[in-house]
């Protein structure tokens, strides 16, 4: 007998959701044709053969913009459910969310002062 019977559904879901991708990769490996022709080994970009040097170096600016975007995107993910249940949660959760936003604003000011948001 399973001791934590209230978690049966959780463990069943975890096992099934772990087995589905493993089985998909296994079946794909068995059914996929194995061919190492010249077209398979050549590089292409969006279905077009590259002309000249295909390697392009991206500047750190793109990385910094992406990083700042991800930080504020995650902020939105956390703040949206809070805003939807604001009237139920009360003032203490409002203070916690305010502290969270203030920490992110400090991070934004730091990135701004370091020049992470400067394009030129």
UniProtKB/Swiss-Prot annotation:
Its EC number is 7.1.1.-. InterPro entries: NAD(P)H_OxRDtase_bac/plastid (IPR023043), NADH_UbQ/plastoQ_OxRdtase_su3 (IPR000440), NDAH_ubi_oxred_su3_sf (IPR038430). GO terms for biological process: photosynthesis, light reaction. It is found in: Plastid, Chloroplast thylakoid membrane. The chain crosses the membrane at residues 14-34, 64-84, 88-108. Its main location: plastid. Pfam families: Oxidored_q4. It comes from the Eukaryota. Signal peptide: none annotated. GO terms for cellular component: chloroplast thylakoid membrane; NADH dehydrogenase complex. Keywords: Chloroplast, Membrane, NAD, NADP, Plastid, Plastoquinone, Quinone, Thylakoid, Translocase, Transmembrane, Transmembrane helix, Transport. It is a multi-pass membrane protein. It catalyses: a plastoquinone + NADH + (n+1) H(+)(in) = a plastoquinol + NAD(+) + n H(+)(out); a plastoquinone + NADPH + (n+1) H(+)(in) = a plastoquinol + NADP(+) + n H(+)(out). It is an enzyme of class 7 (translocase). GO terms for molecular function: NADH dehydrogenase (ubiquinone) activity; quinone binding. NDH is composed of at least 16 different subunits, 5 of which are encoded in the nucleus. Belongs to the complex I subunit 3 family. NDH shuttles electrons from NAD(P)H:plastoquinone, via FMN and iron-sulfur (Fe-S) centers, to quinones in the photosynthetic chain and possibly in a chloroplast respiratory chain. The immediate electron acceptor for the enzyme in this species is believed to be plastoquinone. Couples the redox reaction to proton translocation, and thus conserves the redox energy in a proton gradient. PANTHER family: NADH-UBIQUINONE OXIDOREDUCTASE CHAIN 3 (PTHR11058:SF9). This is NAD(P)H-quinone oxidoreductase subunit 3, chloroplastic. It comes from Coffea arabica. The gene is ndhC.
